Amino acid sequence: VNVIKELFKLNYDGERSKVKPAPGNKNLITDIPGIQVGHAEDNKIGTGVTVITGDKPFSAAVDVRGGGPGTRETDMLSLENSIGRADAIVLSGGSAFGLDACSEVQDLLRQDNKGYKVGKAIVPLVPGAVIFDLNINDKPHINAIWKLSPWRKLANKAYKSANTDFLLGSFGAGC
């Protein structure tokens, strides 16, 4: 346990963080320097995507629970694993279809030259989780979704709109 505590005191480059823990101005995740949040939603379908990203990779941890969690790459954030870092975190509606949003953000990060360097390859680490919002009986136009997944497009918009000023409440994932 002490080893884990010491690991989390180090930044991505293995240096001790110079940031001292203190309450932020707004008490939001974006009070942490470099962290940004973006949302996008499609109100016609009733779904959305939220992207949390940073200027640099950031420390993150996860505890997945429930009978049918929809996740991608969250195992790398569990305390017993060695990575504990992410380039972005994606939260999306769309149930399993919403996991497309993670791939879009990974593509955008790679285009921005952000990610874990493996030789000449850049591998952005983008864990994500989805919620079930596919209430088919409430959405008679739901079959239109299957022609082209809207979650990649929503993820693109959320990533590109990420900043320190973001809407609070039912926006993005969970709109």
Where are these regions (language model features)?
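Alpha/propeptide regions of enzymes that mature by internal proteolysis
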Residues: 2-175
